[in-house]
C-alpha cells in the first residue's frame, strides 16, 4: 500500500486519513 506522508493528510492516526478507518 502507498502511504503518502502529508502534513495535511496525516492527522491523528499516524497514517494518512485516507487509510484511516
UniProtKB/Swiss-Prot annotation:
Keyword tags: 4Fe-4S, Electron transport, Iron, Iron-sulfur, Metal-binding, Transport
Which cofactors go with this protein?
Answer: [4Fe-4S] cluster
State the superkingdom: Archaea
Note on how the cofactor is bound: Binds 1 [4Fe-4S] cluster.
| Annotated [4Fe-4S] cluster binding sites | 10, 13, 16
**Which GO molecular function annotations are given, in alphabetical order?**
4 iron, 4 sulfur cluster binding; metal ion binding; oxidoreductase activity
State whether keyword Metal-binding applies: yes
Q: Where is the 4Fe-4S ferredoxin-type domain?
A: 2-21
Q: How does it assemble?
A: Monomer.
Function (record text): Ferredoxins are iron-sulfur proteins that transfer electrons in a wide variety of metabolic reactions.
What name has this protein been given in UniProt? Answer: Ferredoxin
Origin organism lineage: Archaea, Methanobacteriati, Methanobacteriota, Thermococci, Thermococcales
Amino acid at each position: 500500500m502507498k502511504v503518502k506522508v502529508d502534513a495535511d493528510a496525516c492527522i491523528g492516526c499516524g497514517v494518512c486519513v485516507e487509510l484511516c478507518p
